[in-house]
Amino acid sequence: MSQRFAPGQAPVQSRYQPPPPAPGMRPYPPPGASFPPRGFPLHPNTTQPVPGTANVAGVPGVPGVPGVPGPSLLQRAAQQPGFQSSLRGTGAGGGGVGSGGGSKRSNESRSLGGGGSKSDFATAKKKKKLAEKILPQKVRDLVPESQAYMDLLTFERKLDATIMRKRLDIQEALKRPMKQKRKLRIFISNTFYPSKEPTNDGEEGAVASWELRVEGRLLEDGKGDPNTKIKRKFSSFFKSLVIELDKELYGPDNHLVEWHRTHTTQETDGFQVKRPGDRNVRCTILLLLDYQPLQFKLDPRLARLLGVHTQTRPVIISALWQYIKTHKLQDAHEREYINCDKYLEQIFSCQRMKFAEIPQRLNPLLHPPDPIVINHFIESGAENKQTACYDIDVEVDDTLKNQMNSFLMSTASQQEIQGLDTKIHETVDTINQMKTNREFFLSFAKDPQMFIHRWIISETRDLKLMTDVAGNPEEERRAEFYYQPWTHEAVSRYFFTKVNQKRAELEQALGIRNG
């Protein structure tokens, strides 16, 4: 019965039916092979039976061992997803668990079933990274002090969540303009140079002239960062500067001195104007601030209504919306419409308008902001330098913004954290390895004989997979192996296959074809 036969051709349709299988019987394996712990098809004409490894008798914890509960045959078959694939993959030479064919098929099934998107992979990688830092429950039971480490992990997760939330808050805050008001002190000085007559020594004479300087600097408010070394240039606060001199003295073509910002403008610490003259000069200095973001001056009627003189467009729209809500001007039925009161009707020249029309209707009511006007008097005959000071309010970037940017861009702490995480992972891996070694030697110390027996069985199973040896020759050479219930079905299947094979050969020889 242990003789090896090559599988025949596919059985043809026959009117003879195979004998019904006895309950609890298993398919007959090829000679030299034993059964894997899997299910099998009940009809013999579906596939070839699959060889495999037999259960090892007398070893606790192994399927089929007396006295040790284990899953039934069909349950074990249902638990193995590669069962049908391994059946379809068997060929003439026979192969199964021992031959490596079924193992290869199951590996392919696992590889095909494990595909996923990049986001799933990233999420799995993050979970794996977190799981690598957690100590197993057995280690925590053995070492009660390890609970302190687990508490630190919980605290670390909460801290990471808090830091991430704060980083998001900072990123949102940086999207909005962060300004603070500072005092800019403007120094306007003039120096008069009297005329000089030419001398006999060859020195040339000089015409009487005067020089006007416009300079400035930010005043320290005591709240700024003392480590800030970058100082803004005076010209960076302004969009344009115009010095208007007396038109009667310098004519219509030479009485204006203008400076306007361009994309290629080089910032400077001040402006200087020099003109000839020995008479008192009245000049007007016009300074237009460079607002970032842009600000607009409201129409006087709207400014009185909202209490806003010069502001940015979002602030103006927000103030108008507050006025509408306060006076309940929004239509009760059509919420997108606004019913203008007598003041808004005079300003917008309409009784009713949509809220979406407000920005468009505001455009004619918004004007460029007024420049800062300084009247200065240049007195002739005074050889000493005369200086006048003026303080104006300007908006500068909040110093906290630079600290926020440096916090978001800093990577030194992240690198340090990654290094510490690597050390933690290595330490946890070492602990897990020591736990495995402890269980290994503890099992050996409790029952050396049974431990070595199990070890040999495990190594034999691995060796069988590596060497592609089918079946279990040690069991097959004993008579008890063939007194199991599956032998009855195996004999029936064998004779059924041989009869079908002979029938097919006879029909082929006689030229009989089945329609």
Curated annotation (Swiss-Prot):
<dbReference type="GO" id="GO:0045893">
    <property type="term" value="P:positive regulation of DNA-templated transcription"/>
</dbReference>
<dbReference type="GO" id="GO:0031453">
    <property type="term" value="P:positive regulation of heterochromatin formation"/>
</dbReference>
<feature type="compositionally biased region" description="Low complexity">
    <location>
        <begin position="49"/>
        <end position="62"/>
    </location>
</feature>
<dbReference type="GO" id="GO:0016514">
    <property type="term" value="C:SWI/SNF complex"/>
</dbReference>
<dbReference type="GO" id="GO:0010628">
    <property type="term" value="P:positive regulation of gene expression"/>
</dbReference>
<dbReference type="GO" id="GO:0019904">
    <property type="term" value="F:protein domain specific binding"/>
</dbReference>
<feature type="region of interest" description="Disordered">
    <location>
        <begin position="1"/>
        <end position="124"/>
    </location>
</feature>
<dbReference type="GO" id="GO:0061629">
    <property type="term" value="F:RNA polymerase II-specific DNA-binding transcription factor binding"/>
</dbReference>
<keyword id="KW-0804">Transcription</keyword>
<dbReference type="InterPro" id="IPR036885">
    <property type="entry name" value="SWIB_MDM2_dom_sf"/>
</dbReference>
<dbReference type="InterPro" id="IPR003121">
    <property type="entry name" value="SWIB_MDM2_domain"/>
</dbReference>
<comment type="subunit">
    <text>There are 2 distinct Brahma complexes in the fruit fly, the Brahma-associated proteins (BAP) and Polybromo-containing BAP (PBAP) complexes, which are composed of common subunits Brm, Mor, Snr1/Bap45, Bap111/Dalo, Bap55, Bap60 and Act42A/Bap47, and additional signature subunits osa in the BAP complex and Polybromo and Bap170 in the PBAP complex. Interacts with sisA and sc. Interacts with mor. Interacts with p53. Interacts with erm (via N-terminal). Interacts with akirin; interaction is immune stimulation-dependent; activates selected Rel target gene promoters.</text>
</comment>
<dbReference type="GO" id="GO:0006357">
    <property type="term" value="P:regulation of transcription by RNA polymerase II"/>
</dbReference>
<keyword id="KW-0217">Developmental protein</keyword>
<dbReference type="GO" id="GO:0007406">
    <property type="term" value="P:negative regulation of neuroblast proliferation"/>
</dbReference>
<keyword id="KW-0805">Transcription regulation</keyword>
<feature type="compositionally biased region" description="Pro residues">
    <location>
        <begin position="17"/>
        <end position="34"/>
    </location>
</feature>
<dbReference type="GO" id="GO:0017022">
    <property type="term" value="F:myosin binding"/>
</dbReference>
<dbReference type="InterPro" id="IPR019835">
    <property type="entry name" value="SWIB_domain"/>
</dbReference>
<feature type="compositionally biased region" description="Gly residues">
    <location>
        <begin position="90"/>
        <end position="103"/>
    </location>
</feature>
<dbReference type="GO" id="GO:0003677">
    <property type="term" value="F:DNA binding"/>
</dbReference>
<dbReference type="GO" id="GO:0005634">
    <property type="term" value="C:nucleus"/>
</dbReference>
<comment type="function">
    <text>Involved in the recruitment and site-specific anchoring of the Brahma complex at specific promoter sites. The Brahma complex is a multiprotein complex which is the equivalent of the yeast SWI/SNF complex and acts by remodeling the chromatin by catalyzing an ATP-dependent alteration in the structure of nucleosomal DNA. This complex can both serve as a transcriptional coactivator or corepressor, depending on the context. Participates in X-chromosomal dosage compensation. Participates in neurogenesis.</text>
</comment>
<feature type="region of interest" description="DNA-binding">
    <location>
        <begin position="116"/>
        <end position="204"/>
    </location>
</feature>
<dbReference type="GO" id="GO:0035060">
    <property type="term" value="C:brahma complex"/>
</dbReference>
<dbReference type="GO" id="GO:0000791">
    <property type="term" value="C:euchromatin"/>
</dbReference>
<keyword id="KW-0238">DNA-binding</keyword>
<dbReference type="Pfam" id="PF02201">
    <property type="entry name" value="SWIB"/>
</dbReference>
<feature type="domain" description="SWIB/MDM2">
    <location>
        <begin position="291"/>
        <end position="368"/>
    </location>
</feature>
<dbReference type="GO" id="GO:0003712">
    <property type="term" value="F:transcription coregulator activity"/>
</dbReference>
<dbReference type="InterPro" id="IPR038041">
    <property type="entry name" value="SMARCD1_SWIB_dom"/>
</dbReference>
<protein>
    <recommendedName>
        <fullName>Brahma-associated protein of 60 kDa</fullName>
    </recommendedName>
</protein>
<keyword id="KW-0597">Phosphoprotein</keyword>
